[in-house]
């Protein structure tokens, strides 16, 4: 992601919405060459970060994306140590959201995943995290949260029914962060959710946290 650093959106940290023709999702989208060995990067002084000597190329591989997506989603979700956080989807992006959620040390983390292999991966590597299948998720979350639902929900799966699952599992006045991208439009049943007073957050990642992410990797806080 490239950004000018000078427009209204960049000045407020919303670099995904940079108004420059060469800002936002430019490189590899509107500008060819994203998969080549060498690329000419617009606004390199604002958008590039030097990899510290203490961080290997392998560790840095996902910093620009998808680890940046998990970091951004966690930041805008306003997670506190008292929260129960539900992450829907344990694919690569879901795991990145989990890694960044762990930094916030919430009361409970629940991961909902339909794949047996992915559930076993979470259970093996993150035993402190609770894991549940989609069909049991709503009941499980209500039983393992303080206020009848998750305080924060991150929807990272992008499945046909996962958006509906996300808001149903959220407690009243919760934050529901839509990290996933969908193939089809999603229905927003406002009459059904009227009394829940939910806060929805969504959009493309603002990829301006890479320096902080590299520091966290260097310190061993993100593995």
Region spans (language model):
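Mid-domain Rossmann-like dinucleotide-binding core that forms the NAD(H)/NADP(H) cofactor-binding site
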Residues: 50-135
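Helix-to-beta-strand junctions that scaffold the AdoMet/dcAdoMet cofactor pocket
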Residues: 170-171
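C-terminal substrate-binding/catalytic core of Rossmann-like NAD(P)-dependent dehydrogenases/reductases
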Residues: 139-143, 147, 181-223
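Glycine-centered, small-residue-biased loops immediately flanking beta-strands
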Residues: 83, 174-175
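Local beta-strand N-terminus motif with an aromatic residue
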Residues: 82, 128, 149-150, 222
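Helix N-cap at the beta1-alpha1 junction of Rossmann-like dinucleotide-binding domains, i.e.
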Residues: 115-117, 160, 183
């Amino acid at each position: 992601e490239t950004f000018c650093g000078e427009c209204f959106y960049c000045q407020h940290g919303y670099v995904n919405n940079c108004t420059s023709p060469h800002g936002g999702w430019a490189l590899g989208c509107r500008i060819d060459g994203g998969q080549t060995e060498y690329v000419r990067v617009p606004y390199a002084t604002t958008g590039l970060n030097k990899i510290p000597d203490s961080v290997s190329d392998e560790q840095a591989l996902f910093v620009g994306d998808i680890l940046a997506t998990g970091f951004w989603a966690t930041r805008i979700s306003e997670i506190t140590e008292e929260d129960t956080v539900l992450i829907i989807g344990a694919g690569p992006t879901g795991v990145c959201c989990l890694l960044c959620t762990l930094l916030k040390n919430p009361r409970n983390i629940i991961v909902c995943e339909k794949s047996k292999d992915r559930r076993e991966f979470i259970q093996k590597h993150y035993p402190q995290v609770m894991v549940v299948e989609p069909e049991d998720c709503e009941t499980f979350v209500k039983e393992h949260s303080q206020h009848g639902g998750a305080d924060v929900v991150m929807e990272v799966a992008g499945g046909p029914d996962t958006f509906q699952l996300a808001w149903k599992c959220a407690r009243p006045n919760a934050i529901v962060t839509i990290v996933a991208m969908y193939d089809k439009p999603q229905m927003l049943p406002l009459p059904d959710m009227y009394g829940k007073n939910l806060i929805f957050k969504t959009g493309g990642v603002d990829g301006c946290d890479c320096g902080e992410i590299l520091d966290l990797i260097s310190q061993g806080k993100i593995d």
